[in-house]
């Protein structure tokens, strides 16, 4: 009898231990999905475009979608300037930030600051926070893909920036339900990784 009771207790404990991470991941995925659908546009010190792949100064489709959205926000008077962020790889002639700045100039944006550091989101935002400290800026509207919004906002806030997100609704990250589900799953894992280790999990090839 005691052995049977012990066995049932162990099974219940194991079930709870299995269920907890499932619930945590599910709740995080719901937050990623919810924040992805929000479009916050408070008047801010700057509109910040998070970097993505560029090819010899030409923004990839993902990056171009972000830049076009940021330009539209700038024309609407959301902020007096746009800041592009993102470093480069060995052999690149341009950083992501520089490529973004060059592109924005071609579409008529007259005040762009390039912060060409960082090979992942956290490193780029650390570079941004240094610029903010030097300039005395406080607030930002972050422009990125919808599923990246929660994690990038959390990182910026942890670095002392009052951050809102206005994600792009165009580009490859928004092209199908399958793509959306894949990004939600990936970003949920990346967000949890950041909250536990306070490190970025997205070092490596940028989105194209």
PLM regions: where:
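Enrichment for repetitive, rod-forming helical segments
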Residues: 18-19, 38, 73, 158, ...
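A structural signal for short, hydrophobic/glycine-enriched beta-strand patches
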Residues: 29-185
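N-terminal type II signal-anchor transmembrane helix
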Residues: 2-39
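A transmembrane-helix-recognition feature enriched in membrane-embedded lipid enzymes
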Residues: 177-204
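Extracytoplasmic/luminal low-complexity segments enriched in Pro/Gly and acidic/polar residues
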Residues: 207-208
């Amino acid at each position: 009898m005691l052995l049977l009771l012990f066995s049932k207790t162990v099974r219940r404990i194991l079930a709870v231990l299995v269920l907890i991470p499932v619930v945590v991941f599910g709740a995080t995925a719901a937050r990623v999905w919810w924040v992805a659908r929000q479009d916050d546009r408070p008047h801010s010190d700057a509109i910040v475009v998070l970097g993505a792949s560029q090819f010899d100064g030409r923004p990839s489709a993902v990056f171009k979608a972000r830049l076009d959205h940021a330009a539209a926000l700038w024309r609407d008077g959301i902020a007096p300037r746009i800041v592009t962020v993102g470093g480069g790889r060995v052999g690149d002639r341009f950083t992501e930030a520089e490529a973004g700045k060059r592109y924005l100039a071609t579409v008529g944006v007259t005040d762009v600051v390039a912060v060409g550091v960082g090979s992942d989101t956290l490193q780029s935002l650390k570079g941004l926070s240094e610029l903010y400290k030097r300039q005395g800026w406080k607030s930002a509207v972050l422009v990125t893909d919808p599923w990246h919004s929660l994690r990038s906002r959390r990182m910026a806030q942890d670095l002392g920036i009052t951050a809102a997100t206005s994600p792009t609704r165009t580009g490859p990250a928004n092209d199908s339900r399958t793509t959306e589900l894949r990004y939600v799953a990936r970003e949920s894992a990346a967000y949890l990784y950041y909250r536990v280790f306070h490190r970025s999990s997205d070092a490596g090839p940028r989105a194209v």
